[in-house]
Amino acid sequence: MPLQAIPLFSLILPVLVAGKFPIYTIPDKIGPWSPIDINHLSCPNNLVVEDEGCTTLTAFSYMELKVGYITTIKVSGFTCTGVVTEAETYTNFVGYVTTTFRRKHFRPTASACREAYNWKATGDPRYEESLHNPYPDSHWLRTVKTTKESLLIISPSVADMDAYDKALYSKIFPNGKCLGVSLSSPFCSTNHDYTLWMPENPKPGVSCDIFTTSKGKKATKDGKLCGFVDERGLYKSLKGACKLKLCGVMGLRLMDGSWVSLQKTEESEWCSPNQLINIHDFHSDEIEHMVVEELVKKREECLDALESIMTTKSISFRRLSHLRKLVPGFGKAYTLINKTLMEADAHYKSVREWTEVIPSKGCLKAGGGCYPHYNRVFFNGIILSPDGHVLIPEMQSALLQQHIELLESSVIPLRHPLADPSTVFKGDDEAEEFVEVHLPDTQKQISGIDLGLPEWKRYFLMGMSAIGFLALTIILAVCCRRIKRRKQSKPNPVELIRKVSVTSQSGRAIPSWESYKVKTGDQPQV
């Protein structure tokens, strides 16, 4: 808000303590002084282009950042992974078929990935069918390999775009960065040799939708472009502007950090890497409108002060401060020398630090050096206090200060990669875990009997095998029975000897050894 009449020391003290000089305009070129009458005093119109005498205004359209534009540009994309599924079958002699599935990878082409993504996005069944395992083939006593190539689409995969060079940043890119997508190079390589990253929209530059068209007025002098009045009514000089491309669009970065799609007729230097642009958000846009209103209000205050001077036919240092030009450019400076009103042409510049205006005690830096005072009076109401300090009775609007601080705090920090290089995958195992291929796991399946023959041949062979097995069983049974009979019909000599017996007188059968014992016992002893 505008500063009202308050004690001078109470105004200066807080600023000195803070160490920050708010936005202020001081002449970098001034003089010579010439006496004027009070009737020659005039208030500067800070909304009229006076810089370098560029007073010719022509309407034109230009591009600037959209209101509400955020620091990062999100680009939706997808990853495409080439997968080869191999089915290996082996049929043994009995007819059992063993099938083993293996998965490998290959590097796909961009055109094939785009087609597969379109299938998935539109719900085309061909995409799901392409992910199925191959139908295994089999032949008796042979190993058969069947392979099938598939493209696995994983979406969304979002990357961050740098508006300065259209580079893309994501952890899946090598070193976290991709130089961009174009018609000649429609994809980005990833940390995995078999995976590509592609934007969902095939048209390059569509994701870089950060501009809006505004209407303003060009300020020229003899055909030379000096600056322009923007859509909010603020004049912006092209002094110190540098060339900067945003999303491939050529433009100028102005001294206040804003960007416009203007090109100066004379050659401008390219911006250095540390010269970033400021965000154009709703708050800054609202502040800029308020700044215009504040400048209009300041002019009304100046007219009121001028009317008071004309009415009272008296002037003071404080009232002279209202006549100062509030924006950079050409204007007038006023002072009192020996009680005489003096006027000088001046070119004002904007300053931010106390040291730019007061580099040392008692030194007011203006016109290229320490400006001399006349009886402790400088100009525009600036005086030298009895203790030797330079005192400035009026400072720029707090809204302008807030505006610049907002711009400075809204720098787009996209010169530095958004991805931490230490998080980039370095091992194959990590890459495999990241891809998470959504296909059937590697598995081993054993089917029923299958000799790889047609239907009737298989049943015929099974029947003949059953008959042969039955005949073999009968033959073996007959042979075993004959051998058993032969063994039973042939007596054992040992058993014959042991089973020989005699008949005693009493008619009882006695084993041969008992008979021998009785006979030997009946003989008389000698």
UniProtKB/Swiss-Prot annotation:
Side Virion surface, residues: 20-459
Cell compartment(s), UniProt: Virion membrane
GO CC terms, sorted: membrane; viral envelope; virion membrane
Spans traversing the lipid bilayer: 460-480
Intravirion side: 481-526
Signal peptide: 1-19
PTM: Glycosylated and palmitoylated by host. Glycosylation is crucial for glycoprotein export at the cell surface.
Highest taxon above the source species: Viruses
Glycosylation sites: N338
Keywords carried by this UniProt record: Glycoprotein, Lipoprotein, Membrane, Palmitate, Signal, Transmembrane, Transmembrane helix, Viral envelope protein, Virion
Lipid bilayer topology: Single-pass type I membrane protein
Coiled coil: none
Family: Belongs to the lyssavirus glycoprotein family.
More info: Arg-352 is highly involved in rabies virus pathogenicity. Its mutation dramatically attenuates the virus.
Subunit structure: Homotrimer. Interacts with matrix protein.
Name by which UniProt lists this protein: Glycoprotein
Naturally occurring in which organism (per UniProt): Aravan virus
Name of the gene encoding the protein in the UniProt record: G
